[in-house]
Amino acid sequence: MFDMSRYFTTIVIFVLIYPILMHSSDDLRANPEVYIGKDRKTQIATGKNYMVVTSDPMATQAAYDVLSKNGTAADAAIAAQLVLGLTEPQSSGLGGGAFALYYDAAKKSLITIDGRETAPISVMGDYFIKDSGEPMSFYEAVLDGRSIGIPGTPALLGALHEKYGTISLKKLIVPAYNLAQYGFLPSEGLSKALKSDIGKLDINPTTRKYFYENNILINHEYA
């Protein structure tokens, strides 16, 4: 018998990561969506059994397909996050951290999972101070790699799946794997972010080749 209760279990994942593509804090204060090139738009949507909301249609489709196959909200969130790490690297990814808020309708319980990234144990208070005694600028720190923390998102997804998942991880990675292996067109938001970061990302040969030399993005390493 089809169990409708699974579709009234709600999950929200907030992904926090130092984006690959960043603007100054002044830009973000004025418009927090500026670095992904998204306009503030309102759209009304309805659903009878379940609903998926992400910032990327491909991630939304991956999660929707999981729910249509009787997967749980946890399964859907994992599939969506794996796709988002590929299609919206300026905002999200396995190299960052996340928080999960999960409501189990059957048990009427709400849980949270802290998967925030952490700083290396060797980091001290002078980590972002130059030899001259001056603090690094924002971009000096980011491009130097010192702003990268120890990822927490993979552990969070693993804990979420262990407790609430019903579909194997091997199946949940398929949408992201196919996109990474065979390619996808960058979204409008990613395209705008890449354009705004010309002069930064294209300095590095690896990011230049991946983001700027092909219209279709293929990421075999991610796959």
Locate the predicted segments by residue.
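Noncatalytic scaffold domains of N-terminal-nucleophile
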Residues: 25-61, 65, 73-74, 78-223
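Sec/Tat signal peptide C-region and signal peptidase I cleavage site
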Residues: 21-23
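Bacterial N-terminal signal peptides
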Residues: 10-19
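Bacterial N-terminal signal peptides that target proteins for export
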Residues: 2-11
